């Protein structure tokens, strides 16, 4: 399953969720608005912006239509090849 870490008032988060829904991708939303521990954990892992999207095989941060398209094409596993 895909997890999308978001925060209230995050335009990139909304764009990511809307595009994933439009492409028929199932995902869990993890709202970290009031979860400072989770926000810190994501920062320690190197993520500096939201949303953070975690698939079975990889993760990325920010609005990334290319990665979302890969997930839609390949199921929950995004292509591991970096471009």
Task: Walk through the language-model features, giving the residues of each.
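Short acidic DE-rich linear segments
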Residues: 76-83
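ATP/adenylate-binding site constellation spanning eukaryotic-like Ser/Thr protein kinases
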Residues: 7, 35, 47, 65
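A short, hydrophobic beta-strand/beta-hairpin element that forms part of a small beta-sheet core
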Residues: 51-61
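Thiol-based oxidoreductase modules, predominantly thioredoxin-like and allied folds used
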Residues: 25-38, 49
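Short, flexible helix/strand-to-coil boundary loops that buttress conserved ligand/catalytic motifs
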Residues: 17, 64, 72
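Local sequence-structure signature of Cys/Sec-based thiol-disulfide redox active-site neighborhoods
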Residues: 1-25
